[in-house]
Each structure stands twice: as structure tokens, then as C-alpha cells.
């Protein structure tokens, strides 16, 4: 069966490198949403904990329950309040109109819209939001924002930073000992992080976004069959690839049902073993020159992202959670 190998030493190296930049492991919030961006949240959670990480963020209550044994603090980023929230978790408040829908005495982090205009409360409406929170039975323990253009070389990043500083100054008049976090992976290496803030790290912890980091995920496939493709014979749906000479080919057990982008046989998609995929990818398999029982499909999601004109995030998060993941 296909396999994802996670390099434990590389992951630990990345976390140490990032913690050194921030100042400590205690100021890290590891974002493990969507199965840790496809890498395997339950596999990585104990590694992060053992290094000193105590705070993580996930998408949903279901994701939080999968790793709650490992962390003291788990922030749920995309929750729709239903009145039966778990006091074990912390919930992002993305819309002030939802205050009344939460269970009483639940811990929340207030999301501030500093310019991305996706989720959160605008700075102009913060005073009203503070009044509603203070009159409710919710426990405000933190406040955060998300930078829309931290990886762009324009001024919007700095405008958002300034807006968040204004929000912090305002909320500090009414609440003390709040946990603030604004810097994400893209913002991590763009200057100094405020001393009163934590840092949310997403894809950067897995080796992307800085040349000093190490990729931790490698995708492997295993051989299903092998044959001699004779000169003039074609392989796969539509016969896109035709052999110009006799060649030994093999079919391997990964396809678009496993979360891979479907290769249509056009252009040269080079696999991690240096061989090109031959013909169209099938639902559960692909073909290439015979390279043994196990081959590396990719070690760097950027290569596939460039080929399919997308981003590395999409390549990784689409990887089927049913693919076995192991530490190496």
C-alpha cells in the first residue's frame, strides 16, 4: 500500500529553529488543522509536546478531540456555536452576533478583522464587541488576527499590524492577562514578533517558507504490476503515452482517489525518483518506468504545485488521511 513517511528529526529541527526565532517553545501555537496540513496530526502531536509545545490550533471540535490528550490548550478556529461547547477547549469568536449562541463559561479568543475581511470583528466595532463579551458569561482569554498579505511585498501587512496594535491597546483597558497572537507562518520571518504575543505556525513547521527549514513529508507508492511495453504500444486511458522503444514499465498504487492531482498525460511530471509519469493517472494507480517495489512520488510539494499551477498547501492537504503515515 502507498505510504507517507514523516522525518521525525527534520520536524524536531524545524520546531527548534522556529522556537529560537520566537524565543521559546511556550510561545509557539502549532496549527494542526486539516490533519496537520496532511502530515498527520496524531503522529506529530506527541513530538511537539515532548519539545515543550503546549498550545495548538485546529479547525473543529472533532480535530480537537483527536489530540486533546497531548495539549493543555487547544484553540478551535472554525467553530459554529451550538450551545454545547466543551470547557476543555478554547473557541475562536469570529462573529460578534454569535456571542449568545455559546455555552456559558466557555473560553474564547476574539478574532479581529484587521484587513483581511474574512472573519472577525472590525477594529471600529471592537468597543461594542467588548461590551457584549463583558455582559456575557464567556471567558475572554485571548485575541488574535490573521495577516492576508504577510508574504507580499506591499504595505498592507504593516497596516494590519498597526490595526492589531490598536485593538490590543483598546482591549487591554478592560481585560488583563490575555494571550495575543497575530503572526502566522508567512509573517514569522518578517521582522520581530512583539514580546507580548505568541506565534501561530502552520506550514512552516513542516519545512516550507524558509530555506533553513527541512521538508518532513515524503510520499511513496508500491508496485502493483510490471510488464514490457513494446515499441508502438500505449499505456493508460486514451493512450496518451506511446513507447518509442521497448521499455519495462510498472504500475504503482497511488491515484487521484488518494488526493493527488490528476495528471492528464500532458507535459512531463517528474516523480521523486527522477522518472516521469507515463500516460494519464488512474483513480487508484499510475505508471512509470519500472523502478522497484517502492518508489518516491514526491518529497517536495512545491514541485507538484508548480506543475499543476497551484500552491503547496493544496498539494499537501488533499493527501487522503487513509494513507498510512509513519515516522522515520
Curated annotation (Swiss-Prot):
Pathways involved: Amino-acid biosynthesis; D-alanine biosynthesis; D-alanine from L-alanine: step 1/1
Cofactor(s) named in the record: pyridoxal 5'-phosphate
Broad EC category: isomerase
Recorded GO MF terms: alanine racemase activity; pyridoxal phosphate binding
GO CC field: cytosol
EC numbers for this chain: 5.1.1.1
Protein's name according to its UniProt entry: Alanine racemase
Amino acid at each position: 500500500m502507498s505510504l507517507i513517511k514523516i522525518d521525525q528529526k527534520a520536524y524536531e529541527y524545524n520546531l527548534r529553529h522556529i522556537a529560537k526565532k520566537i524565543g521559546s517553545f511556550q510561545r509557539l501555537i502549532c496549527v494542526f488543522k486539516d490533519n496537520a496540513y496532511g502530515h498527520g496530526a496524531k503522529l506529530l502531536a506527541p513530538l511537539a509536546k515532548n519539545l515543550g509545545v503546549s498550545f495548538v490550533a485546529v479547525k473543529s471540535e472533532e480535530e480537537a478531540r483527536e489530540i486533546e490528550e497531548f495539549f493543555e490548550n487547544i484553540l478551535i478556529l472554525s467553530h459554529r456555536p451550538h450551545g454545547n461547547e466543551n470547557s476543555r477547549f478554547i473557541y475562536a469568536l469570529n462573529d460578534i452576533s454569535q456571542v449568545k449562541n455559546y455555552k456559558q463559561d466557555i473560553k474564547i479568543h476574539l478574532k479581529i478583522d484587521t484587513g483581511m475581511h474574512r472573519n472577525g470583528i472590525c477594529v471600529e466595532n471592537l468597543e461594542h464587541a467588548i461590551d457584549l463579551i463583558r455582559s456575557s458569561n464567556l471567558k475572554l482569554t485571548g485575541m488574535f488576527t490573521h495577516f492576508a498579505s504577510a508574504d507580499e511585498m506591499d504595505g498592507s501587512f504593516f497596516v494590519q499590524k498597526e490595526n492589531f496594535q490598536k485593538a490590543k491597546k483598546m482591549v487591554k483597558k478592560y481585560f488583563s492577562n490575555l494571550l495575543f497572537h497575530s503572526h502566522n507562518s508567512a509573517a514569522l520571518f518578517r521582522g520581530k514578533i512583539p514580546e507580548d504575543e505568541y506565534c501561530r505556525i502552520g506550514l512552516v513547521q513542516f519545512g516550507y517558507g524558509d530555506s533553513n527549514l527541512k521538508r518532513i513529508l515524503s510520499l511513496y507508492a508500491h508496485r502493483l504490476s510490471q510488464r514490457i511495453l513494446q515499441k508502438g504500444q500505449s499505456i493508460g486511458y486514451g493512450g496518451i503515452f506511446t513507447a518509442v522503444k521497448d521499455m519495462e514499465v510498472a504500475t504503482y498504487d497511488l491515484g487521484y482517489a488518494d488526493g493527488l492531482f490528476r495528471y492528464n498525460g500532458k507535459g512531463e511530471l517528474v516523480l521523486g525518483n527522477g522518472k516521469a509519469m507515463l500516460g494519464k493517472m488512474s483513480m487508484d494507480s499510475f505508471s512509470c518506468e519500472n523502478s522497484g517495489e517502492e518508489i518516491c512520488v514526491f518529497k517536495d510539494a512545491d514541485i507538484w504545485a508548480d506543475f499543476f499551477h497551484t500552491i503547496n498547501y493544496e498539494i499537501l492537504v488533499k493527501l487522503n488521511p487513509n494513507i498510512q503515515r509513519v515516522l522515520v
